[in-house]
């Protein structure tokens, strides 16, 4: 019985085509994530400024996928707040403004590892 092996050039061409396809998909996903960030960040900044003006919080940082990752269509907005009277009010204010779920973490309840990473890599709001 003879076993037919695939043409090596055909296999290489197929692999190149698959690689190009996935590289294109990854590039599109990155572009979409950057567009989401660009659309959301100004609204989050404005909302946090309003929260500060209303005395709801003193300091805030963006972390998570909107700060250092690639936010997907189901990503929430993660915010660490300090000097916050009502984290739920801040989450509600920001969430209504940007139309996304918002997760607010109070500085006093955040693990030291999260605070350290946010201070080093987060976006000051």
Annotate each language-model stretch with its function:
Residues 1-58, 68-73, 82-125:
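Catalytic core of pol beta-like nucleotidyltransferases
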Residues 62-65:
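Glycine-rich beta-strand-to-loop/alpha-helix junction loops that act as flexible
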């Amino acid at each position: 019985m003879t076993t037919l092996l695939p043409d090596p050039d055909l296999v290489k061409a197929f692999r190149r085509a698959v690689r190009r396809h996935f590289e294109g998909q990854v590039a599109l996903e990155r572009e979409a994530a950057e567009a989401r960030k660009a659309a959301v960040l100004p609204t989050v900044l404005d909302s946090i400024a309003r929260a500060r003006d209303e005395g709801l919080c003193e300091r805030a940082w963006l972390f998570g996928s909107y700060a250092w990752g690639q936010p997907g269509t189901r990503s929430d907005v993660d915010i660490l707040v300090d000097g916050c009277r009502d984290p739920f009010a801040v989450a509600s204010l920001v969430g209504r403004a940007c139309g996304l779920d918002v997760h607010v973490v109070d500085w006093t309840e955040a693990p030291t590892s999260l605070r350290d990473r946010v201070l080093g890599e987060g976006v000051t709001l």
